[in-house]
Amino acid sequence: MALDISNYDPAVSAGAKIGYSRGGGAVTQITDRVTGVTINALSGRITTMTTSLAAEASAAFIVTNSEVAIGDVVVVSMRSGNSNLQTSVYVSVTAAGSFSITVANNTTAAGAAETGAIIINFVVIKAVSA
């Protein structure tokens, strides 16, 4: 069975750009850095809560997303908002209907907490596992 992504207009231009021209979304995390969010889109933006994240600490949260299948690849990048320039974000788990993002404060300096509202871009790459 072929995957139908016609509702999402995958776009490839003469400038060798690839992506979705519509179907994105945005969501803001509430309460704390481990509170899950729901966004049912193939691409979008997640804004994290500004709760303090201590040096050498990490926090993971679940993104519920009906567009994600277990064999898909989810890519994330930090758009802006990290306060100490030592913060990283990555996908730690992908499952059917969800994925988890981990935010890590990689600084070793005592008292160097991450306090920014981090904006994370994400995209779901539809994939098939053999």
Positions of PLM-derived features:
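Glycan-recognition/cleft segments
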Residues: 86-94
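Extracellular receptor-binding modules and their adjoining Ser/Thr/Gly/Asp/Asn-rich linkers
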Residues: 1-68, 79-80, 94-130
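Short, surface-exposed alpha-helix to beta-strand junction/turn motifs within ectodomains of secreted
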Residues: 74-77
